[in-house]
Every structure is written in structure tokens, then in C-alpha cells.
Amino acid sequence: MKLIEAANYEEMSQKAADIIIAQVKEKPDSVLGLATGSTMLGTYKQLVEDHRQNGTSYRNVRTVNLDEYIGLSPDHPNSYRYYMNQHLFSHIDIPLSQTYIPNGASDDVEAECRRYEQLIESLGGIDLQLLGIGRNGHIGFNEPGTSFSAPTHVVELAPSTRQANARFFPSFNDVPRQAITMGIATIMKSRHILLLASGTAKAPIMAKLFEETVTTDVPASVLHTHPNVTVIADQDALSLVPDEKRKVYAK
């Protein structure tokens, strides 16, 4: 695990975008694993701006998103398909037919999980997976207690996760209770993982992540066992991580 420190959210976003752009330029048909949420907005904004200014092409890129709420149609304003179209896909030259997100409106969500897992394998696996980290350490929607060997599956969302996402919905009760998520095993097959963290709200879980104890109680801790993980975090998110730890991981 390598740590890249950023002064603030804007710098974190730029550094993340630079890594994604480099990946796409090196391998134009890359498979990118993408994430949603407020942490990613700055990165996607930078990718759109770079595409506009420099013409970086995504014509041959394939994307697979981490997760999707169950019960929301793709055109629902709070679906992750809608988020991705609004913030990235509609502003770059990627064909929508090459962008894949679990179908949360499927009549058979268990079959959809199996289909999605097979889809990722058929694409040759994920070259670069973008991740955020939840306040409870979740990655994707893999909540504490999730098996590290889990493939794509249906998950019951923890109350804390639903509360964190309630600001996007009319009320807490409107937040879906279930989602389809790539499993931890699915994520860990990615060739390179890029985890982003910003803000003081993430400081406690980042301190726990850098304690190095690998446990299902902190799903993100499994990343310590992956050979190629880059963490980009701003000073607020790192405020509880001791300087000596930062130095070790910055090398």
C-alpha cells in the first residue's frame, strides 16, 4: 500500500485523475472500475475537463461500477447509473454500451449478481479500480462482517450507510435498504486499486486502516493484502494518522 498525501480535496481529485488518465493513455482499452459518492465528484470533474482540453479518449475503455441500489430504475435521479451519466459518461467520448453497472431493477437480483461477476471476468478483469471508504470501513457496499471471499452479491445496507446517503434522498426512509455490490473478492482481483479519502469525517476510519490489522470488521483493511494499492488522502482525512505511519507508507 502506497500513500500519496494531498493538501485538500481539490489536490486529491487532481492526483487521482492523473493516475486514471495515465492508465487510459497507456492502455486505451482499459477496464476501469468506478465508484460513486461525493468523494469521486472532483475526480470525474477533472477527467471531463482533461477530455475537453486535451482530448484524452475513452472510446475503447470499458467501465464497471462497484454497486447499485436495488429497486431504483436506471433513470431514477438517485440511481448510480444516473449519477455516472450525469457526472462523467455524458461528457466524454465513451459509448454507453461499454459502461456497465449492476441492474438494481432486475426481477432476479441473485441472477443479476452472477451475470455481473461473469461480465467482469469476460472483460478480462479490472485494470484500475477506484474506491472510496465508508465511515465504518466499507468498500463498495461491503459492510463490516462481509466475507473477504464474497463475489458480487446482494447486501443489506447498514443503518449508518443509509444515514450517510440520506442527504441525497427526500428522507431516511426513502433510502433503499438493499444494494448489489461487487464482492471483496471481486475488488481484490483488480490489478491496481486506487482508494480516495477526504475530510475530517473519514479521519477515524483512516487511522484504523493504517493500524494494519486485517479484519472483516474493517472491510477496507483487506487492501493491505493486495500487491498494488494506492491511497490518496487529504490532510483532513489523515489528521489522526501518526506521522511515522505516513512516512512508512509514503515510501
Swiss-Prot record:
Quote the catalytic activity from the record. alpha-D-glucosamine 6-phosphate + H2O = beta-D-fructose 6-phosphate + NH4(+)
* A Gene Ontology biological process term: carbohydrate metabolic process
The yes or no answer to whether the keyword Ribosomal protein is present is no
One GO cellular-component annotation of the UniProt record comes to: cytoplasm
The record, for HAMAP family, names: GlcN6P_deamin
The function of this protein is: Catalyzes the reversible isomerization-deamination of glucosamine 6-phosphate (GlcN6P) to form fructose 6-phosphate (Fru6P) and ammonium ion.
Give the record's family classification: Belongs to the glucosamine/galactosamine-6-phosphate isomerase family. NagB subfamily.
Q: What is this protein called?
A: Glucosamine-6-phosphate deaminase
Provide the species name.
Geobacillus sp. (strain WCH70)
Designated gene of the protein: nagB
